[in-house]
Swiss-Prot record:
Name the record gives this protein: Mitochondrial-processing peptidase subunit alpha
Lineage of source species: Eukaryota, Metazoa, Chordata, Craniata, Vertebrata
Transit peptide interval: 1-33
Subunit structure: Heterodimer of PMPCA (alpha) and PMPCB (beta) subunits, forming the mitochondrial processing protease (MPP) in which PMPCA is involved in substrate recognition and binding and PMPCB is the catalytic subunit.
Disease tied to this protein: Spinocerebellar ataxia, autosomal recessive, 2: A form of spinocerebellar ataxia, a clinically and genetically heterogeneous group of cerebellar disorders due to degeneration of the cerebellum with variable involvement of the brainstem and spinal cord. SCAR2 is characterized by onset of impaired motor development and ataxic gait in early childhood. Additional features often include loss of fine motor skills, dysarthria, nystagmus, cerebellar signs, and delayed cognitive development with intellectual disability.
Length: 525
């Protein structure tokens, strides 16, 4: 056996008594093998004879990428988008969410998200639903935001009929048993505890900045169920909400990777004339309130000294988010605001996936590169059908909170100043790149189709959005920033807030020419 191994080793190495075998793999033989065989003299730039000519996608023929929309007799809209491949993503998007809970117990949308894909009239349990989807290689998910609830399934296109039937049952025929509600109560309670303990404060700060910006109205209502309401929400409360907001005229059945007519036929079969589990009484208690921006401050004092992701503790930080009202996604200024947000950019001290992303954005150049003690500085833009919020999140040591806030207010003031052509073009290119790369994903296309059709009854195609981005000029960015700076700020603060400036001082800084905070005088140091 040892002799065989030794022989094989020598053969592979080409040494010893087997050295002559190397001639078989020498340069002349290798060149003959790789010369092209039957096509030795045809350059790569010429087509091979007898080989079918490949057909490539062209940039023209936009009709192939148009979103088709059909409205059924009951008001439900069916939207579809072609995408090649054997899998599809189909779902139902509903115009409901936490912003519509003013007349209800806050937290209903959070409960419904956790209750999704539980037992229904046709399926006895969540396991049965998952087994049905597995036969078509499918997965399911439900997400709620402040203004939209989305039930989605990705599966083999051949199972479209089964998928739409399942979605209709999940949305319109949920059982909402006492056991399921109790299990959901525990899941919601756990998520609230996790929200308050997780090292990443961004979800909590986003909740707080909305609460400060829109005091007790529409998008300022709690997205997560308040602790005091967890025990109060039951089947009757859920049915009361569903009766008003889960109506066909507030729904869109969207699909990507499916034939439009097939999807419409499935919608007529499973979503037309269906009696929902909560009855078919008229929706009489719909909240049609328009968002009222108020500005203000939300503070949460907390010991952040023992927060860690593992054995290595994170430095004790104070987190600040300062925001101003922007505009709705239905307005023309939405695109300039999106470019402005990309121009501000920013990030953390450490970037996942390698350095280089946004390193020439303003918050990197002016903040993170110049102030080593700043742990994070990132710009965010939240936009809804009747309002919007552009904000900057910053983190630093509690002893440098005042200086950090002043740096952020200065950056807000600089937004209304001169816009360099190079940085604007870079931001526009980054925004276009991000848009197109995200839309390579089927679930993202599905969400884009569904949300646009739900909000506007049509869809702007990617090339139209790219044209709008290219047309943004420096004066457009300066105009929207100057308009934004005339409003009241919204402030969220988390951590050790001993040195946090007052709301009035922050407001004064944002109204000044240089963004400086008013000087404070102390009798005793």
């Amino acid at each position: 056996m040892a002799a065989v191994v030794l022989a094989a080793t020598r053969l592979l190495r080409g040494s010893g008594s087997w050295g002559c075998s190397r001639l078989r793999f020498g340069p002349p033989a290798y060149r003959r093998f790789s010369s092209g065989g039957a096509y030795p003299n045809i350059p790569l730039s010429s087509p091979l004879p007898g080989v079918p000519k490949p057909v490539f996608a062209t940039v023209d023929g936009q009709e192939k990428f148009e979103t088709k929309v059909t409205t059924l007799d009951n008001g439900l809209r069916v939207a579809s988008q072609n995408k090649f491949g054997q899998f599809c993503t189909v779902g139902i998007l509903i115009n409901s969410g936490s912003r519509y809970e003013a007349k209800y117990l806050s937290g209903i949308a959070h409960f419904l998200e956790k209750l999704a894909f539980s037992s229904t009239a046709r399926f006895d349990s969540k396991d049965e639903i998952l087994l049905t989807l597995e036969k078509h290689g499918g997965i399911c998910d439900c997400q709620t935001s402040r203004d939209t609830t989305m039930y989605a399934v990705s599966a083999d296109s051949k199972g479209l009929d089964t998928v739409v039937a399942l979605l209709a049952d999940v949305v319109l025929q949920p059982r909402l048993t006492d056991e399921e509600v109790e299990m959901t109560r525990m899941a919601v309670q756990f998520e609230l505890e996790d929200l308050n303990l997780r090292p990443d404060p961004e979800p909590l700060l986003t909740e707080m900045i909305h609460e400060a910006a829109y005091r007790e109205n529409t998008v300022g209502l709690h997205r997560f169920c308040p602790t005091e309401n967890v025990a109060k929400i039951n089947r009757e409360v859920l049915h009361s909400y569903l009766r008003n907001y889960y109506t066909p005229d507030r729904m869109v059945l969207a699909g990507v990777g499916v034939e439009h007519e097939h999807l419409v036929d499935c919608a007529r079969k499973y979503l037309l004339g269906v009696q929902p589990a909560w009855g078919s009484a008229e929706a009489v208690d719909i909240d049609r309130s328009v968002a009222q921006y108020t500005g203000g401050i939300a503070k949460l004092e907390r010991d952040m000294s023992n927060v860690s992701l593992g054995p290595t503790p994170i430095p004790e930080l104070t987190h600040i988010m300062v925001g101003l009202e922007s505009c709705s996604f239905l307005e023309e200024d939405f695109i300039p605001f999106a470019v402005l947000n990309m121009m501000m950019g920013g990030g953390g001290s450490f970037s996942a996936g390698g350095p280089g992303k946004g390193m020439f954005s303003r918050l990197y150049l002016n903040v993170l590169n110049r102030h080593h003690w700043m742990y994070n500085a990132t710009s965010y833009h939240h936009s809804y059908e009747d309002t919007g919020l552009l904000c900057i999140h910053a983190s630093a040591d509690p002893r440098q909170v005042r200086e950090m806030v002043e740096i952020i207010t200065k950056e807000f003031i600089l937004m209304g100043g001169t816009v360099d052509t190079v940085e604007l073009e870079r931001a526009k290119t980054q925004l276009t790149s991000m848009l197109m790369m995200n839309l390579e994903s089927r679930p993202v296309i599905f969400e884009d189709v569904g949300r646009q059709v739900l909000a506007t009854r049509s869809r702007k195609l990617p090339h139209e959005l790219c044209t709008l981005i290219r047309n943004v000029k420096p004066e457009d960015v300066k105009r929207v920033a100057s308009k934004m700076l005339r409003g009241k700020p919204a402030v969220a603060a988390l951590g050790d807030l001993t040195d946090l400036p007052t709301y009035e001082h922050i407001q004064t800084a944002l109204s000044s020419k240089d963004g400086r905070l008013p000087r404070t005088y102390r009798l005793f140091r």
